[in-house]
């Protein structure tokens, strides 16, 4: 940790012990992340699987889980969406450590203890830093909300509603039923 302040840098966060704890960094402050529950883990895996399967046939980028993205510097902010997508042309030669810059797509799956104000702040931060599409999935309500820059959020509630990521991952869509099965 820095001697002059209580703020932590992204480089310092990367050197934290790998002890199965997860952290995010918000304006230099370490935010511990709780372990996820059953529904959260199931939805992350299912949606990640759907995206991975599609990207095998259409290799336009890479999908990953819980990767740290350096979004702000001085003080540093590192966010780790539950699922993220980066277009192929943005993948750096050196993929060690946190990714510098925003993902093209950030997906957050809600946990029961997530506060709406915290989720909204995270969505706003992603959009302000250049994320093209933010998806918030609520496993308890079985709903999905999509957020794009300068447009109102779009809620999806019915099993037949389709999550369309075509503006980021061309051709990809799936029904809510597929996400929550």
Roles of regions detected by a PLM:
Residues 1-181:
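Gly/Pro/Ser/Thr-rich low-complexity, intrinsically disordered segments predominantly at protein N-termini
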């Amino acid at each position: 940790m820095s001697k002059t302040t209580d703020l932590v840098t992204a480089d310092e966060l990367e050197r934290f012990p790998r002890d199965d704890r997860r952290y995010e960094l918000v304006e230099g402050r370490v935010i511990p992340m709780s372990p996820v529950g059953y529904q959260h883990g199931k939805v992350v895996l299912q949606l990640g699987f759907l995206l991975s399967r599609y990207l095998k046939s259409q290799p336009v980028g890479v999908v990953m889980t819980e990767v740290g993205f350096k979004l702000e510097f001085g003080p540093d902010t590192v966010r780790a969406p539950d699922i993220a997508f980066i277009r192929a042309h943005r993948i750096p030669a050196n993929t060690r450590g946190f990714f510098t810059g925003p993902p093209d797509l950030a997906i957050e799956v809600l946990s029961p203890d997530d506060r709406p104000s915290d989720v909204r702040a995270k969505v706003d931060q992603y959009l302000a830093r250049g994320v093209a599409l933010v998806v918030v999935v609520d496993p308890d309500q079985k709903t999905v909300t999509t957020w794009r820059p300068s447009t109102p959020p779009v809620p999806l509630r019915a099993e037949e509603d389709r999550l369309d990521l075509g503006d980021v991952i061309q051709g990809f869509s799936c029904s809510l039923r597929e996400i929550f099965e």
